[in-house]
């Protein structure tokens, strides 16, 4: 990619016109990651990227993009806003490399769906996917920056907190296929209602060039014009005969004949698998390859990982994030389990004025489960007056309590929003000897 193209797309001005015939390899916002021939973009956020320009040049940067007028002996593009510039460059990369892009949004299940789609598509295509949860106005461009010329497919998450954010991302990368996993209560504090969350998620169609795939069993999505999957008869791809455990599920779908599919996911995540299957079929993946891929799928770290510790405890490590919908799903799995259960639950964040209302629904979910001890963590959970529940401020207090307990042969659920860092409790159980 040449400097003139970058200059045009960012609508910037050249400060230093040395060697404008250079070809840029990659775009980076971390000066430590710069290699020879890369472009360093000085973002201004929690830290000011302009402070690290000298390090970027030392590491081999061939071009820098800045929003402050600085003079270095290197080609430099001055723009009004480097945060907006990375979006413009992401659009340029999209047009230059032109992979088929699959964009995914939804209240819950974005990462699981992305991983499932990637697992299926890589059986036939060279694929690229979002790293971690790179799904906002910074993360999506970073995902595009990592694209290679020979990537045929890019599977990209899109998250949001407010109206307009997904519209911006969709127009930036103009997806060929879009996915909405479901409509729940995540970010309801900012948007005010599920109806508004639906409107915000549907912004993914603003830049969409092809079909929309949705969970047709979701009551907010079933009336949308889309390719649908689920268990209801209104769907284009219909699953049936579902059997499941904590670690896996088996179900059937009908194509030219019935096919049985096994995937290492519990029942409340099968809607994500069905969307992935539907997209795989749309993109001409043989059903036998889809079945093989799903049978070998392993869930993402801290998302419904089933672990064993030295005391024969089974740990459900689901502490990457939480919502009322995902918590309901995992607690439903435990209703018929006879094991002694320890439910370690932390706050659900980003609920705004709806926080008390949603947290107050949790006791009704807990009432359905027998043989349980309940540990509630965080300022919102402390407001829940649940019978015999133990409350702690944070994971550190919780671990101090657990050190005094003898816990063996139990089924332990650990779940909360990301900021509570409950993976530290998981690590405590797995590494008792080091505490």
Residue ranges and their predicted role:
Residues 45-46, 160-163, 184-186, 217-219, ...:
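Short glycine-rich anion-binding loops that position phosphate/pyrophosphate groups of nucleotides
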């Amino acid at each position: 990619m040449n400097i003139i193209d970058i200059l045009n797309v960012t609508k910037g001005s050249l400060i230093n016109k040395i060697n404008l015939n250079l070809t840029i390899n990659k775009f980076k916002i971390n000066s430590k990651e710069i290699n020879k021939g890369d472009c360093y973009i000085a973002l201004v956020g929690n830290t000011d990227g302009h402070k690290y320009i000298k390090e970027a040049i030392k590491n081999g940067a061939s071009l820098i993009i800045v929003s402050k007028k600085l003079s270095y002996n290197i080609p430099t593009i001055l723009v009004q806003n480097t945060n907006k510039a990375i979006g413009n460059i992401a659009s340029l990369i999209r047009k230059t490399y032109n992979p088929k892009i699959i964009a995914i949004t939804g209240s819950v299940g974005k990462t699981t769906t992305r991983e499932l789609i990637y697992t299926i598509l890589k059986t036939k295509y060279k694929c690229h996917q979002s790293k971690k949860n790179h799904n906002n106005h910074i993360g999506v461009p970073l995902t595009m920056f990592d694209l290679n010329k020979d990537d045929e497919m890019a599977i990209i998450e899109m998250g949001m907190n407010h109206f307009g954010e997904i519209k911006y991302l969709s127009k930036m990368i103009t997806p060929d296929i879009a996915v909405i996993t479901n409509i729940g209560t995540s970010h309801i504090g900012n948007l005010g209602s599920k109806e508004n969350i639906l409107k915000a998620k549907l912004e993914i169609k603003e830049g969409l060039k092809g079909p929309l795939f949705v969970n047709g069993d979701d009551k907010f999505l079933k009336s949308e014009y889309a390719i649908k999957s689920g268990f209801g008869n209104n769907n284009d791809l219909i699953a049936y005969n579902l059997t499941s455990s904590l670690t896996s599920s088996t179900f059937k779908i009908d194509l030219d004949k019935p096919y049985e599919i096994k995937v290492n996911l519990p029942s409340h995540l099968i809607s994500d698998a069905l969307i992935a299957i539907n997209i795989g079929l749309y993109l001409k993946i043989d059903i036998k390859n889809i079945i093989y891929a799903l049978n070998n799928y392993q869930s993402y770290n801290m998302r419904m990982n089933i672990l064993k510790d030295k005391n024969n405890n089974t740990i459900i490590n689901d502490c990457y994030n939480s919502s009322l919908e995902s918590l309901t799903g995992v607690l439903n799995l435990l209703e018929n389990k006879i094991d002694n259960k320890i439910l370690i639950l932390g706050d659900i964040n980003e609920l705004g004025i709806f926080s008390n209302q949603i947290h107050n629904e949790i006791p009704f979910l807990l009432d359905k489960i027998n043989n349980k001890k309940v540990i509630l963590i965080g300022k919102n959970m402390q407001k829940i007056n649940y019978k015999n529940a133990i409350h702690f401020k944070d994971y550190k207090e919780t671990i101090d309590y657990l050190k005094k307990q003898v816990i063996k042969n139990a089924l332990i659920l650990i779940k909360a929003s990301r900021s509570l860092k409950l993976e530290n409790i998981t690590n405590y159980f797995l590494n008792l000897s080091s505490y």
